[in-house]
């Protein structure tokens, strides 16, 4: 079994309901179970500011699935909850599920990049992750605690 860390975000169609439904769906993924869930945080949008704030959280999910199998499930959950993928980056969305980490693996395929390509620059991903895995060490040996200390990300407000 591998522990995958998944970032959850929503800023459309009742974000609290979206995230709670996503958590139920993540818990229903075969050969997987949720270990822990962070608090829910309210964060400003990345990119265009003419959209609602996001609800962000992190989940530790233990799974025996392969990384791309897990990705298939997370993308199916997004679609079931009304996610429409548009050319516009950082636009509003009903649900965003990003596989931030998959054990200690480094994955770089056409469909999946793990660790998440920009997570070390995103406080809205790192603070919830720190809440559930404060001693986490990235595959490159960098400690999550040290990243948060040296980059001085603003603390997040709870939802």
Swiss-Prot record:
<protein>
    <recommendedName>
        <fullName>2-amino-4-hydroxy-6-hydroxymethyldihydropteridine pyrophosphokinase</fullName>
        <ecNumber>2.7.6.3</ecNumber>
    </recommendedName>
</protein>
<keyword id="KW-0808">Transferase</keyword>
<comment type="similarity">
    <text>Belongs to the HPPK family.</text>
</comment>
<dbReference type="GO" id="GO:0016301">
    <property type="term" value="F:kinase activity"/>
</dbReference>
<comment type="subunit">
    <text>Monomer.</text>
</comment>
<comment type="function">
    <text>Catalyzes the transfer of pyrophosphate from adenosine triphosphate (ATP) to 6-hydroxymethyl-7,8-dihydropterin, an enzymatic step in folate biosynthesis pathway.</text>
</comment>
<keyword id="KW-0547">Nucleotide-binding</keyword>
<dbReference type="GO" id="GO:0003848">
    <property type="term" value="F:2-amino-4-hydroxy-6-hydroxymethyldihydropteridine diphosphokinase activity"/>
</dbReference>
<dbReference type="GO" id="GO:0046654">
    <property type="term" value="P:tetrahydrofolate biosynthetic process"/>
</dbReference>
<keyword id="KW-0418">Kinase</keyword>
<dbReference type="Pfam" id="PF01288">
    <property type="entry name" value="HPPK"/>
</dbReference>
<dbReference type="GO" id="GO:0000287">
    <property type="term" value="F:magnesium ion binding"/>
</dbReference>
<dbReference type="InterPro" id="IPR000550">
    <property type="entry name" value="Hppk"/>
</dbReference>
<keyword id="KW-0289">Folate biosynthesis</keyword>
<keyword id="KW-0067">ATP-binding</keyword>
<dbReference type="GO" id="GO:0005524">
    <property type="term" value="F:ATP binding"/>
</dbReference>
<dbReference type="InterPro" id="IPR035907">
    <property type="entry name" value="Hppk_sf"/>
</dbReference>
<comment type="pathway">
    <text>Cofactor biosynthesis; tetrahydrofolate biosynthesis; 2-amino-4-hydroxy-6-hydroxymethyl-7,8-dihydropteridine diphosphate from 7,8-dihydroneopterin triphosphate: step 4/4.</text>
</comment>
<dbReference type="GO" id="GO:0046656">
    <property type="term" value="P:folic acid biosynthetic process"/>
</dbReference>
């Amino acid at each position: 079994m591998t522990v995958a860390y998944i970032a959850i975000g929503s800023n459309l169609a009742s974000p609290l309901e979206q995230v709670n439904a996503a958590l139920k769906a993540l818990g229903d993924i075969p050969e997987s179970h949720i270990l822990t869930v962070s608090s829910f945080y309210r964060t400003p949008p990345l990119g265009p500011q003419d959209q609602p704030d996001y609800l962000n959280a992190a989940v530790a999910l233990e799974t025996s699935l392969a990384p791309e199998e897990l990705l298939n499930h997370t993308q199916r959950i997004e679609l079931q909850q009304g996610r429409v993928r548009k050319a516009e980056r950082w636009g509003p969305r009903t649900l965003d599920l990003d596989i931030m980490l998959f054990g200690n693996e480094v994955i770089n395929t056409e469909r999946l990049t793990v660790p998440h390509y920009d997570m070390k620059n995103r406080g809205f991903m790192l603070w919830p992750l720190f809440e559930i895995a404060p001693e986490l060490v990235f595959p490159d040996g960098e400690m999550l605690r040290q990243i948060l200390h040296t980059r001085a990300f603003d603390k997040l407000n709870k939802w």
